[in-house]
Amino acid sequence: MSAADEVDGLGVARPHYGSVLDNERLTAEEMDERRRQNVAYEYLCHLEEAKRWMEACLGEDLPPTTELEEGLRNGVYLAKLGNFFSPKVVSLKKIYDREQTRYKATGLHFRHTDNVIQWLNAMDEIGLPKIFYPETTDIYDRKNMPRCIYCIHALSLYLFKLGLAPQIQDLYGKVDFTEEEINNMKTELEKYGIQMPAFSKIGGILANELSVDEAALHAAVIAINEAIDRRIPADTFAALKNPNAMLVNLEEPLASTYQDILYQAKQDKMTNAKNRTENSERERDVYEELLTQAEIQGNINKVNTFSALANIDLALEQGDALALFRALQSPALGLRGLQQQNSDWYLKQLLSDKQQKRQSGQTDPLQKEELQSGVDAANSAAQQYQRRLAAVALINAAIQKGVAEKTVLELMNPEAQLPQVYPFAADLYQKELATLQRQSPEHNLTHPELSVAVEMLSSVALINRALESGDVNTVWKQLSSSVTGLTNIEEENCQRYLDELMKLKAQAHAENNEFITWNDIQACVDHVNLVVQEEHERILAIGLINEALDEGDAQKTLQALQIPAAKLEGVLAEVAQHYQDTLIRAKREKAQEIQDESAVLWLDEIQGGIWQSNKDTQEAQKFALGIFAINEAVESGDVGKTLSALRSPDVGLYGVIPECGETYHSDLAEAKKKKLAVGDNNSKWVKHWVKGGYYYYHNLETQEGGWDEPPNFVQNSMQLSREEIQSSISGVTAAYNREQLWLANEGLITRLQARCRGYLVRQEFRSRMNFLKKQIPAITCIQSQWRGYKQKKAYQDRLAYLRSHKDEVVKIQSLARMHQARKRYRDRLQYFRDHINDIIKIQAFIRANKARDDYKTLINAEDPPMVVVRKFVHLLDQSDQDFQEELDLMKMREEVITLIRSNQQLENDLNLMDIKIGLLVKNKITLQDVVSHSKKLTKKNKEQLSDMMMINKQKGGLKALSKEKREKLEAYQHLFYLLQTNPTYLAKLIFQMPQNKSTKFMDSVIFTLYNYASNQREEYLLLRLFKTALQEEIKSKVDQIQEIVTGNPTVIKMVVSFNRGARGQNALRQILAPVVKEIMDDKSLNIKTDPVDIYKSWVNQMESQTGEASKLPYDVTPEQALAHEEVKTRLDSSIRNMRAVTDKFLSAIVSSVDKIPYGMRFIAKVLKDSLHEKFPDAGEDELLKIIGNLLYYRYMNPAIVAPDAFDIIDLSAGGQLTTDQRRNLGSIAKMLQHAASNKMFLGDNAHLSIINEYLSQSYQKFRRFFQTACDVPELQDKFNVDEYSDLVTLTKPVIYISIGEIINTHTLLLDHQDAIAPEHNDPIHELLDDLGEVPTIESLIGESSGNLNDPNKEALAKTEVSLTLTNKFDVPGDENAEMDARTILLNTKRLIVDVIRFQPGETLTEILETPATSEQEAEHQRAMQRRAIRDAKTPDKMKKSKSVKEDSNLTLQEKKEKIQTGLKKLTELGTVDPKNKYQELINDIARDIRNQRRYRQRRKAELVKLQQTYAALNSKATFYGEQVDYYKSYIKTCLDNLASKGKVSKKPREMKGKKSKKISLKYTAARLHEKGVLLEIEDLQVNQFKNVIFEISPTEEVGDFEVKAKFMGVQMETFMLHYQDLLQLQYEGVAVMKLFDRAKVNVNLLIFLLNKKFYGK
């Protein structure tokens, strides 16, 4: 379509559709047709008008006019329109399918009607008369779309009147449509038979609907129109002010503008009406040419708005904030949220908006929407500013308090608007900010100061963390970032910065400082820069030194050595000549050594030469003084001085003995006399020859010396030289030694004499001992006579004493008899005491009989009496032991789940270890990579799994302390509770996904959701899911009964996998382990049922025994093989053995039906019943074969074939089954499979037909086994669980699920929600609406969003959280909720239990009617206080609901009143009957008491079961640990082999008595260049390579090498070279790499060099 003019080029009016030209005569039918076409055209114009108006309001394109009706059916555009004029009613978030993706994919959905309803509610909110409203079905079902367009037109006029939207255009006659489009619309209108609404009467209807006095309003509007025609502004304004016109916001200064605008509007309307009436026969309306009240008000608002905008623009130009605020308050604009205190903010924001608008090329003033946006932005900015000030104040207060965690918490406050803060660096923030705060003049940091400081400190924190983890890239990125604020960063010094920072970090740790500060980092950078600069200057200085040496001038050499940049130590001017001699000699030696005449000395060589020269000078001076002292001592005649001088270490004389001091002195004095006899030349100089071949000149007068020969030098003739002195000493010492040799033998004679004297003494001692031994009999006789005499005398004395004391003896006897009598009495008493326990037992037996009778009454009686129930009601209390058992149970569940995940992760890592060891053998990876992975395995990943579950305190994470995150957390808890307790959703979801995706989903999410069935509740719910899913699969997927056997049903696979894992592993082990172990231990058992195999084994055996080749053919058919008698014999033996061992397996299986997990048996029952329901004609045998396929073939058979893979048997690390053992087990499994399916051996296996009869007999046993296995109770009977169990359990269910699993589940539910829950009011739709769109991993964890390809994202997705599941739709005890009969019953029973415990009575009615005594009330209060104390100690996951806690605070009387209220409601609901005194409730309480006992028993059994599972998992972890040890020993062997092959040569003296040291290799760059290893060094000529040395040293870590570079002896840099990185580069085909960012090396040749020198390969 296109816009067209009303008049053609000739000025003739153009006919419209339906018009009749003057020369045109039409029939009645043609006129009707033309009229229908005109109606269609007019409606299309209205559609175009509505489309353009909505586009202006929404700011987005709508579908073409001919498709607009269809595009409005989903209500999205209508809902967006509702949001435009009433955002409070219609939120964008509540618009269903806002982007219309679902509509485009699947068409209309019933929930699209929500959008239409929201639009209608929005119109109702603003007050549009309901006479214009369409029905929902008019739009959704397209029953009356013109009604919708009519409503949009009315809405546009109404909004124009309110000043909320622009006026809709009148496009009649101004747009063109094709003939086809008009005909299509005509057909569409005729199809539905729709009566076209009167669009032209909208204004009048709207005025009538909104007015009180229609006649007065009509007259006032006509008067205004007449005044407009007169074009007198004063008259028009007077008419407008008529109260009956109901016009508002009139401003007299704008009267002339009102007149102009209204006059123009009326002229336009009259023109449009004229065009329309020329081509229409319908009845005209008075308002077709007159302006309606709404149009008048709309134009007034338009003028007011324009005027207000002009005033605002003027205020902005003048920069007057007060005038701007007054202009913004104009009612015509209707701006919301204006606050006078924010006037300056409005001025700033609107000036900015205006400037931006002008920059974009728009010069018109800011419009109303832009002003509102600016006001909102300014209010927000002002509010943020105030909040920011408050947050900054809190931060300063927290810094002053000195609590690092509190400071970081305040810094992380979003209202502070600070850069990102990292909690792990809390101490760093506290320390540095506190320092800055103290330095601040006002001791408070401003927001800009905090922003800069936090930004820099965060960067420093990241640097610290990167240094700890060794992340080099992150360290450099932060160092070079402008955010960090470091200065003088040089990229070429990058590696040095990193090395120094690593050392600084290590030093900080050693000093117990967790972080290095910004100042530390800046100082480190400055230090490195200084060192680099000094190195450069030092190299230049070394060059100057070498040049001076070549010139041969000692003074120039001295000046060069004294250059400060060289930093040479110990340079002395007086040693200049010796420096020259020493260094030039060293330079020549180096040139000869490397055969390069241009060789130069390096720094360490020059420094060494200086130190050596200084040392030589000191030693020469001491030597000269020592020789002079000897001469002086000899001349003085003092023997002591002479000996002391001779023994001085400075002169280096040997063989000096103190005993020969006088002889030395006399001999030297004699030598002196001989020199004197020759004559004295009186020279003051002496020349000494010193080590190194140099002469040292010593002045005897000044006692100084030097290396330079003095002018006119003459050697002093009187001084003894060292050689002369040494010669004299050697002669004297030799003579003394000969004399002492004789004196050395005196000790031998002394020792000989001592031995002789000792012999004589020993001989005398032995003689005395022999004499005494001969006299022993006589000595013994004398001693015995003496003892006998003494004993007889003592006896006689005792008899005499007793005879003299007879009275006393009688008294003693009487006392003894009394003691005996008393003892008999006491023994009798003790007898009674000893039998007190028997008496107590008798009494207890009587009491127990009474209690047993009461308990039998409680258990068996239909209506147990109140008295009996009251005795046992205390059993309903939760004791400390109950709480402890619940805590133990929760802890054990968590540990089991953690251990399951740990073992799974460990198993995956072990598999990866297998692969890496295999690659190691193929030289694809380095040994060190395997070693590092091995170290990782030893931790068993428990720490990692534990850390993954600690997400709760991350900033912005799912468990962050904010209302938004709390709502998100609760929404997920509600969702997963619904999924867990309603199996229909997951059962349908499984079959909505592809096979591979559903399997992964089940393995991860479903088992996690049910905590791997770690307790009774979760096992019950999981089995419900299995049951529902299996029934769904059979119903929708299975067309033939054999598909269960031939296919791979999803649910069956999941059930078998679950029950064969950790949960059913013990069962399989108990059933199969004994017989499997027996088979494996029988080494003689060899089952072969293939005749060809038997034949080949026989032939091989004959050839091995005879040593000759057999004449029999090797390749034969089974028939040919069976032709040999030996083969038949061996086959019969194998069959007998196979039948015997198979029978053992069969007996073990059929006798262990009770050991099979209940879940496995229950699913077998469900499978049988479901198949029978779908295939009623299937026989019993056919169904049992399917059950056999499940219980035996899928569940047991794999464990028999591969017992090692299913932990049926234990193998040592590295151990495995032999081929014969596997073949034996495979043959047995095949037999059992044939027996379970009643399949005979035929065809190719005809030679086994002899055991077909045995198979038939075995099938009958299997048949009875399968029938028994299916005979199990239903879930509710087995677990005693129903839909109300969660309302009374002590603890809330908790699951541990990863972030990735949460997001995956959320995504799948959104994608398939219509399939799994087709009903619109299904609860899951509400829960998914609560959650909204699928969140990102980062938003749930609390990390900042990063790169989509971030490799850490996968690790983040595995982070686990715990969700405490709750039910949103049934909250017991909530007073504001509608409580059903069950909830009221539970609450009432709980209160009754509390009352009857403390108040006795025969019936409940009697107790409720009898007032409680004060003693009963006091006892009740004490009990409630004890309960409150116990509840306070209860963990959050076990706390009771709020209403239960409130009930505990009631008195007995209040509780009785609440009970009576509950009983009244229950009576009305028909739950209880007051005629029998509410005996039903007493019976329910009795049942609860019985069930509480069963629950405790189940809990104990569950705890035992979990402990067994935990032990089994620990055993499996131990096995994995053994595998780890096995791998480590293998790796150690590889390392030992590698080390033993290394070609590290050692000198003999190093090999003997010393530990071997790490060898280091030194190469010049020139040598490496010759070998091809070094390609080039940037900025260095090849002829300078000889001055560069590379030193390669192995580190403590295998495969790591430290490479040091020196230039002219100056230590430049150190580079860590990783052998595994080299291999990786080689594997990737990288031929060249850089060292030190400058030296390019050949990767392959470098690997070859390292292998050759360090690994010997």
Curated annotation (Swiss-Prot):
Name assigned to this protein: Ras GTPase-activating-like protein IQGAP1
GO molecular function, a single term: actin filament binding
UniProt gene name: IQGAP1
Subcellular location field: Cell membrane; Nucleus; Cytoplasm; Cytoplasm, Cell cortex
Example of a GO biological process term: positive regulation of MAPK cascade
Region (C2): 1276-1657
Annotated positions of the N-acetylserine modification: 2
Role this protein plays: Plays a crucial role in regulating the dynamics and assembly of the actin cytoskeleton. Recruited to the cell cortex by interaction with ILK which allows it to cooperate with its effector DIAPH1 to locally stabilize microtubules and allow stable insertion of caveolae into the plasma membrane. Binds to activated CDC42 but does not stimulate its GTPase activity. Associates with calmodulin. May promote neurite outgrowth. May play a possible role in cell cycle regulation by contributing to cell cycle progression after DNA replication arrest.
Source organism phylogeny: Eukaryota, Metazoa, Chordata, Craniata, Vertebrata
Post-translational modification: Phosphorylation of Ser-1443 by PKC/PRKCE prevents interaction between C1 and C2, allowing binding of nucleotide-free CDC42. Ser-1443 phosphorylation enhances the ability to promote neurite outgrowth.
Written domain comment of the UniProt record: Regions C1 and C2 can either interact with nucleotide-free CDC42, or interact together, depending on the phosphorylation state of Ser-1443. When Ser-1443 is not phosphorylated, C1 and C2 interact, which prevents binding of nucleotide-free CDC42 and promotes binding of GTP-bound CDC42. Phosphorylation of Ser-1443 prevents interaction between C1 and C2, which opens the structure of the C-terminus and allows binding and sequestration of nucleotide-free CDC42 on both C1 and C2.
Keywords assigned: Acetylation, Calmodulin-binding, Cell membrane, Cytoplasm, Host-virus interaction, Membrane, Nucleus, Phosphoprotein, Repeat
CDD domains: CH_IQGAP1 (cd21274), RasGAP_IQGAP1 (cd05133), WW (cd00201)
Residues with Phosphotyrosine modification: 172
Pfam families from the UniProt entry: CH (PF00307), IQ (PF00612), RasGAP (PF00616), RasGAP_C (PF03836)
Effect of residue 1443 to D: Strongly enhances neurite outgrowth promoting activity
Entry GO CC: actin filament; apical plasma membrane; axon; basolateral plasma membrane; cell cortex; cortical actin cytoskeleton; cytoplasm; cytoplasmic ribonucleoprotein granule
Chain positions with Phosphoserine modification: 2, 330, 1441, 1443
Subunit structure: Interacts with CDC42; the interaction is demonstrated with IQGAP1 in GTP-bound and in nucleotide-free state. Interacts with RAC1. Does not interact with RHOA. Interacts with TSG101. Interacts with PAK6. Interacts with TMEM14B; this interaction increases IQGAP1 phosphorylation and induces its nuclear translocation. Interacts with SASH1. Interacts with PJVK. Interacts with SLC26A4; this interaction enhances the chloride-bicarbonate exchange activity of SLC26A4. Interacts with SVEP1. Interacts with ILK; the interaction is required for localization of IQGAP to the cell cortex. (Microbial infection) Interacts with ebolavirus vp40.
Keyword Kinase included in the entry's annotation: no
Chain intervals for the UniProt region annotation (Disordered): 1410-1448
Transmembrane residue ranges: none
Tissue expression per record: Expressed in the placenta, lung, and kidney. A lower level expression is seen in the heart, liver, skeletal muscle and pancreas.
Ranges of compositional bias, category Basic and acidic residues: 1417-1448
